[in-house]
A protein has these predicted regions:
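N-terminal loops that bind phosphate or other acidic moieties
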Residues: 2-349
Length: 349
């Protein structure tokens, strides 16, 4: 689907399916809402899929891999070559996300949407890395749309293969810089308030990073009311690709799990493009990056975990898969009040 076709297919979650799922939970022989957010999330997933019979047996992680030209400004501790190394390690089960996926019973799909050199992972390359946003726009508007459509395509493909839920992840040196820039614009924040040390910058490095972001925003003047313009001028291909996954999930009625800071920025972009996307987003954890709480407050979707994680790659998103499996085991397998010939609990007024 094109971006335009995708947006036409996005509708709010199915309230009838949500009501049916809630009624089933209330008939299960346990105190009402005693599994808390686990129950709420299953109800939300029923609304996303339009079916109270929730099936998440096939689970995926899509990792958007791309380089960022802004690394030329010295805003990272690691060199650009690390992006390709880690991206190819996903397929060798030598990266954190791939190891967690194996344990969680999920399949990983690393996508080369913009690595600076050729790679051996799934190819949907829009550019060989973005331009240096300190000097010129990161990409054209057309390239930003193309990156969004890569994410949409991935969801369509995975739906055809029977996947019922998709987690989002990324790999790209310099992407906390681009994510902070996008956040600063969309949420009208000073860059100093939404910029962290990334993978381990010194105090001097952090000041440089903040300065680069502030100058890039002043140079390009991205329009906060136009998320695609923001992505094109100060964003990254990985962010745009993940935003496309969120858009595609909403259009295809598949729940999409946000990971940490960068993934949540992508979710924010998708929701700003189409507000109904919010109904299809599950947030997994609270990252250590300073902007995370600001973004989560803007998204207004409760998170599952607070484990001080900040690795990226989709690691936090995949970590909630076993929790969802346990929730669904209760939802689908536990006896009801009628099975036990017991009276239902009555909600307190």
């Amino acid at each position: 689907m094109t971006l335009e076709e995708t947006l036409e297919k996005i509708h709010p979650a199915d309230k009838t399916a949500m009501e049916a799922a809630l009624a089933h939970w209330n008939n299960i022989a346990m105190p009402l809402h005693s599994l808390g957010r686990l129950q709420d999330t299953v109800v939300r997933i029923a609304g996303m899929t339009g079916n109270a019979r929730v099936d998440l047996k096939k689970k995926a992680l899509v990792v958007m891999c791309a380089d960022n030209g802004v690394v030329e400004e010295g805003v990272t501790q690691s060199g650009q070559e690390v992006t390709k190394i880690v991206a190819e390690n996903f397929l060798k089960e030598k990266a954190t996300a791939s190891i967690l996926c194996k344990k969680a019973g999920a399949d990983i799909f690393p996508v080369d949407i913009g690595i600076a050199t050729d790679s051996t992972i799934l190819q949907h390359k829009v550019m060989y890395g973005t331009n240096n946003m300190a000097k010129e726009p990161a990409m054209t508007r057309e390239q930003a749309v193309q990156a969004l459509e890569v994410g949409i395509h991935m969801v369509e493909e995975l739906k055809e293969k029977g996947y019922g839920i998709i987690a989002t992840g990324e790999m790209g040196i310099g992407n906390t810089t681009t994510s902070s820039a996008v956040t600063a614009v969309l949420l009208e924040q000073d860059p100093a308030e939404v910029t962290g040390r990334g993978a381990g910058l010194s105090g001097t490095g952090l000041k440089k990073k903040i300065s680069v972001i502030r100058d890039a925003i002043a140079l390009h003047k991205p329009k906060k009311e136009d998320p695609i313009d923001v992505l094109a001028k100060v964003g990254g291909l990985d962010i745009a690709g993940m935003a496309g996954v969120f858009l595609g999930g909403a259009a295809c009625q598949i729940p999409v799990v946000a990971d940490g800071f960068i993934s949540c920025v992508a979710a924010l972009c998708a929701i700003r493009i189409c507000p109904a996307v919010k109904d299809y987003v599950i947030t997994s954890h609270k990252s250590k990056e300073p902007a995370t709480m600001i973004i989560l407050e803007a998204l207004d979707i409760p998170v599952f975990l607070d484990c001080d994680m900040c690795l990226g790659e989709g690691t936090g998103a995949v970590t909630i898969y076993p929790i969802l499996d346990m929730a669904l085991a209760v939802y689908g397998g536990m006896c009801t009040f009628s099975d036990n010939q017991m009276e239902n609990y009555v909600p307190l007024v």
